[in-house]
Amino acid sequence: KKYLWIDADAWVNSWESIELYIKGSENKKLAISTSADRSYGRVLRAEWFFGSFAKIKSQNYKHAKSSGFSEEISREVALKPHLNIGVFCLEEDAPHWKIWQKNLKKALSSGKIWGSEQIAMNIAIYSDKLEVEILPAYCNWTLIEGLRFDKKQNTFVEPYLPNHKIGIIHLAGKDNDNIRKNKNF
């Protein structure tokens, strides 16, 4: 038995992605996409001090630290691709469920709710070393301003070649608040 989760602010544009999530979750692997793609531009932020010295800022590091995880774990996940749990698939008896729950309890004990479930899963994969199948970004597309509509195929596609069909369009992130509120979108 498998569980496929799709956030309420996402919709299926191409069934191929659903098939990839189901196939990717075979053998107790987590099937999931990252929040990074060649179309997305910047994936890390840096606070430049002087010359070539900078403080790197990543979503994984920020959430791990604010959720009370150790400096070692926070650094371990800091530069890894951020896994977006807005869409994922997992077998019911996969070990991820218990480890995710353990990590989520730790994250929530800090009092930080926003992002806690996501960093808990990122730590389960990168620090606890659970099996993962990382799918292409078009399986959980969050760059709404990067959507391109292909009139020939009558569907949304990636902006760069090979212009693959977007599988799931996900209005995740604060940058998409206006789109979520737009009833004409």
Set out the residue ranges of the language-model regions.
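Glycosyltransferase catalytic domains, chiefly GT-A lineage
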Residues: K1-F185
